[in-house]
């Protein structure tokens, strides 16, 4: 009942709080992420054609995972998917789709039956979020809720969520640790990430 594996992936911002490449490696080699036996785990990566997403897909493919990319190409290009194939010698399955599209996401999950989702998809510009708060709340929060609903309906209980250092607002201290207070965000983008952390935590404990 609900999603039982939730991880927050803190991404690098202008202050360089976290190293993105090391995050990709830690995701790839995390103990327990592979299936038993010889069958490769299938991982669906939302926003997989973006910068962080595409680098993560390279690491996953090179580690032997099956990768399915879902990206609406709002801030990415299908050329990134081609480049992933060139780098790894393996072609990931790609769907141009929006995570808010319930019917399309249901179709993808029914066909692919992923074991795990790594969730990068979402609007991500701090300044733009101040000008377009409705778009950010609708895209990031409603999109993730739709994704979680489709996951539940298809028996996929593992999600790794890409959060952001913006959840700390103006941090109480630097360098930031997990003990740093959260929830005093300074922009709508940060609030979407903070709210989603809470939503996923609630789903985890349901």
Summary of predicted features, one role per range:
Residues 38-206:
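N-terminal Rossmann-like NAD(P)+-binding domain of SDR-like oxidoreductases, especially those catalyzing
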Residues 20-40:
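Short, Lys/Arg-enriched N-terminal segments with co-localized hydrophobic residues
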Residues 14-15, 26:
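Serine residues within intrinsically disordered or low-complexity segments
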Residues 2-6:
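Extreme N-terminal basic, low-complexity initiation segments
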């Amino acid at each position: 009942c609900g999603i039982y594996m939730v991880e927050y992936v803190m991404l690098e911002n202008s202050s360089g709080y976290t190293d993105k490449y090391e995050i990709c490696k830690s995701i790839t080699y995390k103990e327990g992420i592979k299936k038993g036996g010889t069958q490769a785990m299938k991982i669906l990566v939302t926003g997989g054609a973006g910068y962080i997403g595409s680098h993560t897909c390279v690491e996953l493919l090179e580690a032997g995972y099956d990768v399915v990319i879902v990206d609406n190409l709002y801030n990415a290009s299908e050329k990134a998917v081609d480049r992933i194939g060139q780098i790894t010698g393996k072609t990931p399955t790609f769907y141009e789709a929006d995570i808010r599209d319930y019917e399309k996401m249901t179709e993808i999950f029914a066909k692919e039956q992923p074991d795990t989702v790594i969730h990068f998809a979402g609007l991500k510009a701090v300044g733009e979020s101040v000008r377009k708060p409705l778009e950010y709340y609708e895209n990031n929060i409603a999109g993730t809720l739709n994704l979680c609903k489709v996951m539940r309906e298809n028996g996929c209980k593992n999600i790794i969520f890409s959060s952001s250092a913006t959840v700390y607002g103006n941090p109480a201290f630097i360098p930031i640790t997990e003990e740093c207070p959260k929830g005093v965000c300074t922009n709508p983008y940060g609030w979407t990430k903070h709210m989603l952390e809470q939503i996923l935590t609630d789903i985890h404990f349901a």
